[in-house]
């Protein structure tokens, strides 16, 4: 059932993008920009992203960012399997926010890091990103955002709902 819901959600997002692209010609640059903005807003209302900001760009901070990503993903994924829409996903993330923060801090401490971690549901800007066959335009999206230390390093992101998070964990 969950797989059907994810496939249906992705199909709706793809169809929205295809219709928006067809209804605007690239020759009319203003219309093309408006089309992209409309498409992004439509998609943004249907997905919840996951964003982890590293403390810095040092190799150690970048490595622990990935470990936090994996630990939080392993913790929250079983709860998200029951979610059938973005509202349920958002509620589940909120219900488990204290544990998400605790898992993040425990992962940092287990790897010898003394800086902290915070997490929140927020709206933030994302660049264009492709997950498998699906490309999401740059723009502002709702996200579970985890900040490690100063949050000044390169970050990692994915789509939490529908769950596309671990299709590409190399970037």
Predicted regions span which residues?
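Flexible, solvent-exposed short loops/turns enriched in glycine
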Residues: 32, 157-171
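Intrinsically disordered, low-complexity acidic/polar segments
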Residues: 59-61, 128, 155, 167
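Mid-length scaffold segments of soluble, non-membrane domains
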Residues: 86-154, 159
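Hydrophobic membrane-insertion alpha-helices, especially the h-region
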Residues: 6-20
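N-terminal, intrinsically disordered, polar/charged segments of Gram-positive cell-envelope systems
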Residues: 25-49
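Positively charged n-region of N-terminal signal peptides that target proteins for export
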Residues: 1-4
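Solvent-exposed residues in well-ordered beta-strands and their adjoining turns
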Residues: 53-55, 149, 161
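Early exported N-terminus immediately downstream of N-terminal targeting peptides
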Residues: 46-97
């Amino acid at each position: 059932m969950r797989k059907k819901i994810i496939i249906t959600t992705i199909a709706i997002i793809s169809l929205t993008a295809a219709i928006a692209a067809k209804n605007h010609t690239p020759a009319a640059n203003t219309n093309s920009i408006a089309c992209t903005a409309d498409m992004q807003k439509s998609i943004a209302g249907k997905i919840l992203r996951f964003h982890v900001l590293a403390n810095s760009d040092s190799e150690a901070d970048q490595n622990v960012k990935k470990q936090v990503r994996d630990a939080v993903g392993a913790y929250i994924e079983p709860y998200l399997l029951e979610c059938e829409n973005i509202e349920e996903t958002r509620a589940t993330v909120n219900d488990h926010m204290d544990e998400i923060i605790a898992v993040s801090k425990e992962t940092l401490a287990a790897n010898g890091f003394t800086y902290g971690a915070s997490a929140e549901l927020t709206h933030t800007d994302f660049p264009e990103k492709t997950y498998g066959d699906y490309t999401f335009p740059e723009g502002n999206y709702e996200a579970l955002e985890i900040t490690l230390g100063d949050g000044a390093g390169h970050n990692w992101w994915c789509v939490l709902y529908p769950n596309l998070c671990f299709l590409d964990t190399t970037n």
